[in-house]
Amino acid sequence: MGVKTILYQEDARKALERGMDILAEAVSVTLGPKGRNVVLEKKFGTPQIVNDGVTIAKEINLQDTLENTGVSLIRQAASKTNDVAGDGTTTATVLAYAIIKQGMRNVAAGANPIVLKRGIEKATQFVVRKIMDYARPIENLTDITQVAQISAGNDAEVGSLIANAIDKVGREGLISLEESKSTATELEITEGMGFDRGFISGYFVTNTERMEVVLDNPYILLTDKKITVVKQDLVPTLELVSKTNQPLLIISDNVEKEALATLIVNKLRGILNVVAVRAPGFGDRRKAILQDLAVLTGGDVITADAGLSLERMDIENLGVARRVVVGKENTTIISDSNKQEVLARCEQLRRQMETSDSTYEKEKLQERLAKLTGGVAVIKVGAATETEMKDRKLRLEDAVNATKAAVEEGIVPGGGTTLIHIAAELLEWVKETLTGDELLGGLIVEKALQAPLKKIALNAGENGSIIVERIKESDFEIGYNAATNEIVDMYEAGIIDPAKVTRSTLQNAASIASMILTTECIIVDKNKETK
């Protein structure tokens, strides 16, 4: 075990703060319509130009281990928000930083960190309740276009593309991003289906940055069996597919240890690009979903019921797809063949729904039907250079996530406006309800809620404090349009944020900030010179 450096109390918090200053400064320059870009040097290939908070946060690694711990902690606020809402990562970082900065000042002045934390949590819960109260449900395609446009950095083309995609595949539909061969970004609707199961092992991952497996033109093995005996269950399929030089997706009940090890070895040695996924659902429903997948991919479900076995099967029994994307928790299959078979299967499901008496059964059939008929909207991202392509893809991804979040929980005025208006209500509530250091915690949150708008204004070259005061005196819908430097009705101007993103940014920022404020000791490796 290496030698450790141990810091206590104020020294510990100060060391963390130094790292946070660096990360917050680098990330916050991208906030708002006039936010700047950040260039990331890559070990291989061209540098990447990005405007995405979480991507920048993931790249920052400092030499000083103590400072780096601070970076890692505040990075969690961005990562957590990205996992929950898929957008709002820069705002989460700015909020977390604002709460921590003020909190540390209060702790240094003698406030009790535990009581302070309680105050921060109570104030956060109040704000979250208010956000949900003010949220307006998505009513039309224009709302969707505006949410997507704002999230993609004010790109009108992206806004209408995503709105069209959701219009075509429905609110529950799948949207996939691909790199285009041309410079144009276009939308294509294909046959496809997704389900909530991810890869069995991280060794299958092909894209470590996004932690996902992408297979082009794969064969697909569908079975309701457990794959246990390597020689009988696996080898015949692996031999068939390895001759074709195409990847393989296995969807089965489970893959036992020895069989999984065989697949991983084949993958790591480059013999076969393969990924294994557990089949969705249980019992008869699982068999039915596998049958849906078989119709979509033109394959057979290898099951004893149909007299098929893994030992004696042919390449014709395997399904095929144009593309498969497997994440930690989801799998998307994009196929563009078998249109007639899919339509026939949908008709069959509709007839089953008509004859079924059980409400539960009808719901499940409706779910399957929606997945089959919805298809997948594939947005082919085009750009003149690879650097622009990567930046555009990140913006599109944010926009897709933000739009889905907006559909889920509704929309609120964007540009930090909602937080400013709720801050005024929070101030009254905190003064009436909280006392002592809890009151201080509430006031910290009230002040931190102003930070995103101040930063947006600062990035636009304006005085943030003056803008905040002007917004405070206005109605709830009124906010600051940094693109035109005007005070406007945010709904009319189309500057809106998903309530889910606004809520998640504050919840994650407050959670990380509370943990850091209650830190009394840091233990890190003494492998580098620490200050």
From Swiss-Prot:
GO biological process, one term: protein refolding
Predominant location: plastid
Cellular component, GO, one term: chloroplast
Enzyme Commission no: 5.6.1.7
Recorded GO MF terms: ATP binding; ATP-dependent protein folding chaperone; isomerase activity; unfolded protein binding
Enzyme class: isomerase
Residues binding ATP, per UniProt: T30, L31, G32, P33, D87, G88, T89, T90, T91, G415, N481, A482, A483, D497
Function summary: Together with its co-chaperonin GroES, plays an essential role in assisting protein folding. The GroEL-GroES system forms a nano-cage that allows encapsulation of the non-native substrate proteins and provides a physical environment optimized to promote and accelerate protein folding.
Family: Belongs to the chaperonin (HSP60) family.
HAMAP family to which the protein is assigned, alphabetical: CH60 (MF_00600)
Assembly with partners or alone: Forms a cylinder of 14 subunits composed of two heptameric rings stacked back-to-back. Interacts with the co-chaperonin GroES.
Name of the protein in question: Chaperonin GroEL, chloroplastic
Annotated organism of origin: Emiliania huxleyi (Coccolithophore)
Gene assigned in the entry: groEL
